[in-house]
Amino acid sequence: MSITMSDSSAYGEELMRERFEHLLKAYEKMALMVAEQEEFNAKIEDMALKLLSEKYDNEAYQAELFYRLSNCVEKVLHNKISITDLKTEYEEILEQTLKKECKAYERSCIENVKLKKRTEQATAYYASSSSEP
């Protein structure tokens, strides 16, 4: 009878040790996931601040364009600018706007490619980690 008890207690200890190791691995995995989530959140915050900054810059630029155009209209109304000067000013405004929009489009394309790559990597990572026991 004493042999059975000692075998049983050894089996119980081994089972507890295995459970503890499993819990420890699960905890380490969760700690890693929390760290990754915090890093991801920081990146999202940085991107949000960048977008807000770009929006503010864009709105300021649009206000500048509006005032430049309204200044041209005022000069035309008061006959203070010739048609050729008005055309030149208007073409400069259009050229600057197109350059700015092209740069913004290029940046957004680059960001979209980066985001797509990150999404694919994250999907692959979480698909592989969820299939692990």
From Swiss-Prot:
Induction: Induced during meiosis by the transcription factor mei4. Protein levels rapidly increase during meiosis and then decline. It comes from the Eukaryota. The keyword Translocase does not apply. Its main location: cytoplasm. Keywords: Cytoplasm, Cytoskeleton, Meiosis, Sporulation. One of its GO terms (biological process) is ascospore formation. It is found in: Cytoplasm, Cytoskeleton, Microtubule organizing center, Spindle pole body. One of its GO terms (cellular component) is cytoplasm. The keyword tRNA processing does not apply. The sequence is 100 percent identical to the C-terminus of vps13b. Involved in sporulation. Plays a significant role in modification of the spindle pole body prior to spore formation and is required for initiating forespore membrane formation. Assists in the localization of spo13 to the outer surface of the SPB. Interacts with spo13 and spo15. Belongs to the VPS13 family. This is Sporulation-specific protein 2. It comes from Schizosaccharomyces pombe (strain 972 / ATCC 24843).
